[in-house]
């Protein structure tokens, strides 16, 4: 097991990539502290985690709340004495251009994505420095590299995550802390389906998105979780500041 006896904190576990990654980490032997504002989804993930070789705990709250991030990290460290892996997978999308996006929605998207990366890194990295080792995994998007239509806040936030990831990687490399991003393509998750639902012709938009990938299909959350496992484990010991693209050939096509 690649994460045997490791302690991981994963945000955004109520569904999708966060859930799949948390369950895979547990299956590989980790204790996973689960974080989400959706208590029902988080509890479902906790049940799945507890049916693996690992175990976990549930922490309900807003990832953009710095006090909550600090308190959760302190609780995990108090209980387990360390944090080996931090994965920030919480996210949402409001759609819209820079003209049509409501300022409150813009701020909320950045609070969740960028704040939810910065604040949790800010809380967890000092413990990793004391340990002399740690892995941080952030979630970007292929759209942060390619651009896209009608989703300006989300795409801008994902671009900021890539820049923040690279900055953290350089800042903490000599502390033994690796920081990497995953840039998924369109992954078949509730978040993706909600984004399609904003359009009048949902099936047409789904087909266009599916066919944009060279592989002509959507990705699965479990496929992204495998990339996260690689970055969380010692297998990627010489990898930091990287953006791992898991996009079914979207960017290449």
PLM segments and residue spans:
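Conserved glycine-rich cofactor-binding loop
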Residues: 14-16
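Substrate-binding pocket helix/loop in short-chain dehydrogenase/reductase
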Residues: 97-98, 102-110, 151, 209
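Short, small/polar-rich loop/turn modules that mediate ligand/substrate recognition or access, typified
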Residues: 87, 173, 178, 239-241
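Residue(s) in the substrate-gating loop at a strand-loop-helix junction
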Residues: 141
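Alpha-helical segment proximal to the catalytic Tyr-Lys
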Residues: 126, 170-174, 237
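C-terminal substrate-recognition "lid" of short-chain dehydrogenase/reductases
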Residues: 2, 118, 217-246, 251
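Active-site helix of classical SDR
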Residues: 121, 157, 165
């Amino acid at each position: 097991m690649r994460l045997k006896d490791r302690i991981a904190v994963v945000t955004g576990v109520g569904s999708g990539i966060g859930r799949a990654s948390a369950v895979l980490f547990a299956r590989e032997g980790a204790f996973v502290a689960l974080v989400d504002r959706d208590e029902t989804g988080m509890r479902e993930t906790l049940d799945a985690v507890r049916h693996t070789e690992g175990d976990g705990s549930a922490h309900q709250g807003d990832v953009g709340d710095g006090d909550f991030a600090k308190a959760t990290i302190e609780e995990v460290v108090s209980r387990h004495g360390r944090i080996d892996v931090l994965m920030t997978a919480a996210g949402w999308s409001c759609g819209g251009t820079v003209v049509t996006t409501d300022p409150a929605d813009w701020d909320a998207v950045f609070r969740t994505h960028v704040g939810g990366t910065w604040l949790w890194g800010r809380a967890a990295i000092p413990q990793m420095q004391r340990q002399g080792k740690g892995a941080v995994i952030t979630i970007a998007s292929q759209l942060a590299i390619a651009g896209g239509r009608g989703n300006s806040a989300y795409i801008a936030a994902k671009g900021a995550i890539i820049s923040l990831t690279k900055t953290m990687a350089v800042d903490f490399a000599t502390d033994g802390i690796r920081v990497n991003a995953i840039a998924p393509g369109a992954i078949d998750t509730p978040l993706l389906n909600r984004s399609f639902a904003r359009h009048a012709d949902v099936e047409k938009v789904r087909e266009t998105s599916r066919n944009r990938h060279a592989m002509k299909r959507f990705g699965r959350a479990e496929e992204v979780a495998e990339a996260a496992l690689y970055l969380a484990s010692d297998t990627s010991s010489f990898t930091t500041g990287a953006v791992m693209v898991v996009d079914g050939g979207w960017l290449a096509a």
